Each structure stands twice: as structure tokens, then as C-alpha cells.
């Protein structure tokens, strides 16, 4: 599908709702903890939605956000106005290859080179 931003699981929330929910939730957490280091964990779809927002992109660019390996780490700093500034995204260098969920899969590589270059 060439329009992942229009996806809505039957009986579930729309991609737009996930995008907005993640934005509001992370914003509330950051505002409640100014100047503190925060660790948050979620599932891939929610993470990609937030990274799309943090990069300053509209939801329609969700396909440009790379998929991440399980336990990948992204670092996002927030300025005084609580605006996100990604430092790095989807770092899985701590994983040995045998522990990587992506090492033996290829479905996620489709367009990965394009998405990686979009962040630079």
C-alpha cells in the first residue's frame, strides 16, 4: 500500500490517531519532567509515528521513517519550548547479529535506503 498514513485496523485506531496520541503523550511526559532524562518504550508503529513527528514531518511521510529492530534506541533532545530534536534514530549497535530480528528478514529493507537518506 502506498498510503500507510490512511491505515486503520478493523476495530482499532487510525494511523492519524496513533500519530496524534504519541505526540500528545510524549509532550505531556516531557513537560512533566523538564530537564530530566526519560526512557520510554513502545511498539514499532507507535515509535515510527513519534519519530515522524520529531523529524518535523507530516504523517504522510511515515513511510520515510525507517523500521527499527527490537530494542533499537533513539535519542531525542527537547529545547526550552519542548520541541523535539532527534540526535540519532533506531540505533541497534548493541545487538549481536544473532539477536537482531532484522538480520534474517528482508521485508523492511524495501525503501530503507531511501528512508535513511531522508533523515540526513
Q: How would you label these PLM feature ranges?
A:
Residues 29, 36-44:
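Generic beta-sheet signal
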Residues 31, 36, 52-120:
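Acidic, low-complexity terminal tails and accessory targeting/binding regions
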Residues 15, 19-23, 66:
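Amphipathic, non-transmembrane alpha-helical scaffold segments
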Residues 24-32:
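A generic secondary-structure signal
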Residues 1-17, 110-116:
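Short glycine/proline- and acidic residue-enriched helix-loop micro-motifs
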Residues 22, 41-45, 89:
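Short, well-ordered beta-to-alpha junction loops that form the rim of enzyme active sites
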Residues 46-50:
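Glycine-rich phosphate-binding loops at beta-strand->alpha-helix junctions
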Amino acid at each position: 500500500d502506498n498510503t500507510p498514513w490512511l491505515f486503520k485496523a478493523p476495530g482499532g485506531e487510525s494511523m492519524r490517531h496513533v500519530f496524534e496520541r504519541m505526540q500528545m503523550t510524549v509532550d505531556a511526559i516531557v513537560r512533566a519532567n523538564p530537564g530530566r532524562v526519560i526512557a520510554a518504550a513502545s511498539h514499532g508503529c507507535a515509535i515510527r509515528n513519534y519519530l515522524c513527528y520529531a523529524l518535523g514531518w507530516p504523517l504522510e511521510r511515515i513511510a520515510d521513517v525507517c523500521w527499527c529492530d527490537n530494542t533499537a534506541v533513539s535519542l531525542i533532545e527537547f529545547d526550552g519550548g519542548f520541541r523535539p530534536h532527534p540526535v540519532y534514530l533506531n540505533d541497534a549497535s548493541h545487538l549481536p547479529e544473532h539477536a537482531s530480528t532484522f538480520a534474517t528478514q528482508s521485508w523492511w529493507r524495501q525503501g530503507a535506503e531511501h528512508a535513511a537518506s531522508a533523515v540526513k
